């Protein structure tokens, strides 16, 4: 019998099914930054934290007044792991002190990207989050097997061009799914 290679979902969206009980992930869409045999890492992209970039910059450099535009740049809850650490998703092409290229996207984790965004010299489009979602080896696969998530290839337009409250339904629509029509009960055929 031929063994099949595992399918990894890097650069995909995880769409929480209606029966998702974990409050960290109920009604979320998560961008998978990495997924391999060691586990997975992602950022929830539709949970505004209530903070804005100006408030974060005031904590980083209290002696410098952030530009007014920073008050309109939302910070997201990226997940329950390392919630004091920042992650910035943006289109690839710009590199900062700590940038991981992800194909057409990149993720930066150094403060210089935040100051570049504030100065108007950073990426034109970005999603800034505090914290991330992490799965140990085999954990995400088990959740997928339990029908906790739908998956689809990530779409940068959903990440950067839609308001947070539209991202979940838009990601599901990529699969032709209306989440409001799904039952909260899971099963296997």
Curated annotation (Swiss-Prot):
Top-rank taxon, per record: Bacteria
Pfam families documented for this protein: DUF179
InterPro entries in alphabetical order: AlgH-like
Cellular component annotations (GO), alphabetically ordered: cytosol
Family of the protein in this entry: Belongs to the UPF0301 (AlgH) family.
Entry-linked HAMAP family: UPF0301 (MF_00758)
Protein name in the entry: UPF0301 protein PSPA7_0505
Lineage start: Bacteria, Pseudomonadati, Pseudomonadota, Gammaproteobacteria, Pseudomonadales
